[in-house]
């Protein structure tokens, strides 16, 4: 079972820092995305598509053309643990494109970052099924 904690923080209008620690993953790369809905009534399937307010195609976190929710891959070691710190400018915690109330999803496969040539590369990165998800909420600091 995949479980863990992901913490998002942002100072003023700066980038958002995402700290990830997940356990129970298969070793290797796993797509990690912010999805549009914080709805887990049907498990992770009801979180919708990648958060994409600019209506662009899927890409890598460093690409100009990408979904705002495209956070790339996290890497699990042989122990199934993935730890990462992601700093991103497209997932603010306030304003019209705030990600609070949306969902983070870890996928079963590696995200090809839109460059794999698969029919799903430009929409999902061909990252496979949804292993685990959580809604971005507010907690005291």
Swiss-Prot record:
This protein's record includes keyword Zinc: yes
Enzyme Commission identifier(s): 1.15.1.1
Pfam families xrefs: Sod_Cu
Superkingdom assignment: Eukaryota
GO molecular function: copper ion binding; superoxide dismutase activity
Binding of Zn(2+), residues: 50, 58, 67, 70
GO terms under cellular component: chloroplast
UniProt key word Oxidoreductase: yes
Function: Destroys radicals which are normally produced within the cells and which are toxic to biological systems.
Record protein name field: Superoxide dismutase [Cu-Zn], chloroplastic
């Amino acid at each position: 079972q995949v479980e863990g904690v992901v913490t998002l923080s942002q100072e003023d209008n700066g980038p958002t820092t995402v700290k990830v620690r997940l356990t129970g993953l298969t070793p290797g790369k796993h797509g990690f995305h912010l999805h549009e809905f914080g709805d887990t009534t049907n498990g992770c399937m009801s979180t919708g598509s990648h958060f994409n307010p600019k209506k662009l195609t899927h890409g890598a976190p460093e690409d100009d053309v990408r979904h705002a929710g495209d956070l790339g891959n996290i890497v699990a070691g042989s122990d199934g643990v993935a730890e990462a710190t992601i700093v991103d400018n497209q997932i603010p915690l306030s304003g019209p494109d705030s990600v609070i109330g949306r969902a983070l999803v870890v996928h079963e496969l590696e995200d090809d970052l839109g460059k794999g040539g698969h029919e799903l590369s430009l929409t999902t990165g061909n990252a496979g099924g949804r292993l685990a998800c959580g809604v971005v909420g507010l907690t005291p600091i």
